[in-house]
Amino acid sequence: MDRIKKLSLSILILLSSSLFAQVWTPLHKWQDSPIEWEEKFQKWVESEQVHREMFTKEDSPYKDIYTDCADFIYALRIIFSYENSLPFKALVPGTKYSKIKKYYSQSSKRWNHLDETSRVRSFILHVIDNLGTDHLAHNDSYPIKLADIKSGDIFMIKFTPEGKETQTKHSQVIKSISEIGLFDVIYGTRNTVLEKKNLYHVKQRKFSDNLAPFINHQGFKRFKQPWQYEATVTDLPSYSQEQYKRTNEHQGEGFFKYVQALHKKKDETVEQGAKRFFTSLCESFQERAKFVDSALKYLEKINHRCMNYSEYDTHSTPMRDGQIKALISDAQIFKEVRQPNNEENSYSQLINILFSENSGALEKETIQKACLIKVSENYSFDLVEVKDLLLSGLLSSNPNDKIEYRWGIKNSHLKTKCPEF
């Protein structure tokens, strides 16, 4: 009889713990001393544990959790909190000014019928389904000192592309900072969600000055720790409004050059600079080719009807094209200021050819070998050709356009009559 009672009690305890299970039970606090958990988070983001295939690799416990830009940031913070037995908190929309604020947290018992791994996955999906870029900017992050930017911090973008009326919003995670003061960034997009693709990882990114932060909800920010929701924001570690003051005083001009100087440990050589610019431009156009191809396939899927606002926003390329144009401008300034030599088989030679007004057949062959952008079975461009097309305003960012118009092949009748957003 005693054995039956003990067995019954054990079953009851087991059932009770399952019935009232939190997503996970934290054993630590972010503000624990002497452990610096924020510093550990920064090192974790910089490590190989955070990578492009976090949500696509077969052996990942988080496989098939596809994230756009803000989703990725929330997912990162949840994963680190769970794996290190820390609490997680994010404000529930619409409760910021309520008498009783509500939060998404690991204490939720919504998924107590699931095992722990499944609870964590469900929690991530629930949070990213309900929160986005604006919410992250206004509620779950705060602006920081420019000199204190670290791995794991966020760069938030809000701007109106040239010729457009609708604002573009985006956020990226700083994965690491190079010795020359440029950022490696990792991020998701709506396209990574729709296409179930890997995250983007861009190395040594230098942002263009039109993305300089003018208002409090843009720029370089840090995710709030759970206890910080109850604190005065101005008292938070590294809190600062300096980036907005600097941007407004100088109208954004030279902002990112200033940020780079704060974090630079050494100067790059002329050849290193030439390699960085040439490689970045080549990769940017090749990435654009993949993105345009994805939009064209989506057009086929929807039988070539006009895309609605959401679809248009997902598949258009105004921000991408603007960033490439700014990169071209920076590369040209680099060539004029640093004056790279023409040594054969060097990146310096390639940069000179890229901006030469008198290139011949030999130079064309050299640039084609170094970087060819294949946009379809029928069309390919070398880097000089596609650079000139973009600067001439012939590349279309409209995802409803046919491939010939997307890439500046002069057939104006191919331009869509669908509305632009």
Regions found by a protein language model. Give the residues of each.
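Bacterial N-terminal signal peptides that target proteins for export
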Residues: 1-8
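N-terminal signal peptide c-region/cleavage motif recognized by signal peptidases
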Residues: 16-18
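Active-site-adjacent structural segments surrounding the nucleophilic cysteine of cysteine proteases
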Residues: 21-71, 313, 328, 332, ...
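Active-site nucleophilic cysteine motif
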Residues: 30, 34, 38-41, 55, ...
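Sec/Tat-exported extracytoplasmic proteins
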Residues: 77-84, 131, 159, 266, ...
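...with weaker cross-activation on analogous glycine-rich loops/strands in unrelated enzymes
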Residues: 117-183
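Short peripheral tails and domain-boundary helices/loops at the edges of structured domains
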Residues: 176-198
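Low-complexity, Gly/Ser/Thr/Pro-rich intrinsically disordered linker/tail segments
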Residues: 196-364
